[in-house]
């Protein structure tokens, strides 16, 4: 049994510094690097790619909506053409830094609202998947398990990775509980670990209404901007190793 452990990183920009990237990155197998639209900038991207290479961590693009103020977590009325173009633009930016450090982009995981839009809207998911395929058909598209991001990526011929979340609660249909709700984020370490083991070992999660939902767990996400990110990542890694589960990049 194997699983990938990923984290959204490189999300500082300008004079705004947060997250424990230097402490987290040695503990994970895949880093999703912000590409400048929702967070990150040229200096942070360069440093994050360099850091990932130093720790043999797979580098992935983490493109988001153009919304620094809202951290890319607010829905924006945006056309399919704009979505396609912003995907290509951000992938190109990350590829530049990967090239100078002789690292290959391994995967793509949309951020925040763009991720949720693609998970719930088949047409948007198709646009995202097509952009990734057109940029590089060998890339892995990471998306919410059982969502349109996964099905549409498969339709265009991409390799996919179904993602589950250690620090988020689930609806009965397998979607994530909206961050607008007070109970959307898991902050208790024991609860997060229990959820992770159930998802990885049984391919199931218990929804907020106590319903058992089936899902595929190829990669586990911990949000790098979360208050308990470092603790969660270290404890998840520890318990997976204790259970004999291999932690490998996608």
Curated annotation (Swiss-Prot):
Enzyme Commission number(s) from the entry: 3.5.2.9
Entry's Gene Ontology molecular function annotations: 5-oxoprolinase (ATP-hydrolyzing) activity; ATP binding
N-terminal signal peptide: none
Reactions mediated catalytically: 5-oxo-L-proline + ATP + 2 H2O = L-glutamate + ADP + phosphate + H(+)
Family matches, as SUPFAM superfamilies: Glycoside hydrolase/deacetylase (SSF88713)
Quaternary context: Forms a complex composed of PxpA, PxpB and PxpC.
Name of the featured protein: 5-oxoprolinase subunit A
EC class of the enzyme, as a word: hydrolase
Function: Catalyzes the cleavage of 5-oxoproline to form L-glutamate coupled to the hydrolysis of ATP to ADP and inorganic phosphate.
GO BP annotations, alphabetical order: carbohydrate metabolic process
Pfam families membership: LamB_YcsF
Keyword Hydrolase: yes
UniProt organism field: Staphylococcus aureus (strain MRSA252)
Assigned protein family: Belongs to the LamB/PxpA family.
């Amino acid at each position: 049994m194997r699983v990938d452990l990923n984290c959204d990183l490189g999300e500082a920009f300008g004079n705004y510094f947060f997250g424990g990237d230097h402490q987290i990155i040695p503990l994970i197998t895949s880093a999703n690097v912000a590409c400048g639209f929702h967070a990150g900038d040229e200096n942070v991207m360069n440093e994050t790619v360099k850091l990932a290479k130093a720790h043999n961590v797979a580098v992935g693009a983490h493109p988001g909506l153009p919304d620094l103020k809202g951290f890319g977590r607010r829905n924006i009325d945006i056309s399919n053409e704009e979505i396609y173009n912003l995907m290509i633009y951000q992938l190109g930016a990350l590829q530049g830094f990967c090239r100078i450090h002789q690292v290959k982009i391994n995967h793509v995981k949309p951020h925040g609202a763009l991720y949720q839009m693609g998970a719930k809207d088949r047409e948007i998911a198709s646009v995202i998947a097509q952009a990734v395929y057109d940029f590089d058909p060998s890339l892995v598209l990471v998306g919410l398990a059982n969502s349109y991001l996964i099905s549409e990526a498969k339709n265009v011929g991409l390799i996919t990775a179904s993602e589950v979340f250690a620090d988020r609660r689930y609806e009965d249909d397998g979607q994530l509980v909206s961050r607008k709700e007070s109970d959307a984020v898991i902050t208790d370490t024991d609860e997060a670990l229990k959820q992770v083991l159930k998802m990885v070992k049984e391919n199931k999660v218990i929804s907020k209404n106590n319903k058992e939902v089936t899902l595929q767990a190829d990669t586990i996400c911990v949000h790098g901007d979360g208050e308990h990110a470092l603790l969660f990542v270290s404890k998840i890694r520890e318990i997976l190793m204790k259970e004999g589960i291999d932690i490998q990049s996608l």
